[in-house]
């Protein structure tokens, strides 16, 4: 059983997936930020690999990626940083990024390196389903890496079922068709999540894009197994770079009873 499957079997609700950008705020902050997120109560982590042209990312995450790239972050550097992270970080960790840098590194080489350090899965929003089916899915399975597809409010029911069947670990429900970090219409979000809930999907559903505080996290968790917080946390780090204090305060507020 994968770490992700184990998590979702143990915790049926209110799963908090926290996003952080590799190499941000400093080049060597990566594992420290991950450690602090785990210690503050994150159930799993989504580690963003910075890329110069991130289609799905809003301005806050784009700015953090630009800073990380300026700091010198590369895929090779990231795998070096992650060599021993499993000695102290036990929650599931998925890498989130884009195909271009992964293909430049070599797709199978990338999967082998990710599996070797203890990564659990990948999110690559610009990997089309047909390419996953014909070429890349088999490589991911070879290295026991979960792969998470994204669905949006505009995705048809038939396509949602296809993406759910192909996904393993969880299904990423994008709250709106805009980029990360925008504001969300809570009534529209509830309607969309109720629709997903009624489909009785194979995978647990986590909601992302616009989840930023206790209110939006609680709303998402009414209809899904959990949610992903990204831009709001990166913004908090940007405003107060004391990683331990900022992380503790941020998660305390989100997870408050």
Give a label for each model feature.
Residues 41, 114-121, 140-147, 165-172, ...:
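Glycine-enriched alpha-helix->loop->beta-strand junction motifs that scaffold or abut catalytic
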Residues 27-37, 155-166, 207, 211-227:
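Catalytic cores of alpha/beta
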Residues 11-17, 88-98, 140-150, 198-208:
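Short beta-strand/loop segments at the ligand-binding rim of alpha/beta enzyme cores
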Residues 145-182:
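Histidine/lysine/aspartate-rich catalytic loop segments that bind and position anionic ligands
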Residues 42-53, 121-123, 127-130, 171-181, ...:
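Glycine-rich phosphate-binding active-site loops on the catalytic face of alpha/beta enzymes
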Residues 21, 26, 96-103, 151-155, ...:
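Glycine-rich beta-to-alpha transition loops that act as phosphate-gripper elements at the mouths
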Residues 1-8, 27, 52-61, 70-83, ...:
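Active-site-adjacent beta->alpha loops and helix N-cap segments on the catalytic face
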Residues 18, 37, 48, 114, ...:
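Conserved, mostly hydrophobic/aromatic
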């Amino acid at each position: 059983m994968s770490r992700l499957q184990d998590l979702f079997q143990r915790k049926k609700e209110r799963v908090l997936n926290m996003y952080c950008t590799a190499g941000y705020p400093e080049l060597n902050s990566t594992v420290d930020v991950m450690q602090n997120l785990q210690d503050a109560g994150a159930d799993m982590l989504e580690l963003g690999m910075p890329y110069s042209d991130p289609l799905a990312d809003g301005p806050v995450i784009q700015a953090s990626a630009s800073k990380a790239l300026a700091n010198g972050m590369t895929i090779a550097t990231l795998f070096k940083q992650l060599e021993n992270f499993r000695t102290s970080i036990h929650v599931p960790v998925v890498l989130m990024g884009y195909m271009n840098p992964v293909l430049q590194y070599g797709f199978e080489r990338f999967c082998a390196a990710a599996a070797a350090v203890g990564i659990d899965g990948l999110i690559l929003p610009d990997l089309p389903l047909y390419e996953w089916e014909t070429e890349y899915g088999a490589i991911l399975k070879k290295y026991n890496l979960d792969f998470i597809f994204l669905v949006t409010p505009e995705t048809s029911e038939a396509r949602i079922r296809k993406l759910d069947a192909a996904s393993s670990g969880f299904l990423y429900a994008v709250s709106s068709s805009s980029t990360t970090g925008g504001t969300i219409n809570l009534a529209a979000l509830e309607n969309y999540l109720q629709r997903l809930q009624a489909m009785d999907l194979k995978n647990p559903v986590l909601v992302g894009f616009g989840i930023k505080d206790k209110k939006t996290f609680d709303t998402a968790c009414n209809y899904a197994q959990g949610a992903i917080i990204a831009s709001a946390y990166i913004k908090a780090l940007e405003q107060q770079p004391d990683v331990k204090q900022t992380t503790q305060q941020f998660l305390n507020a989100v997870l408050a009873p």
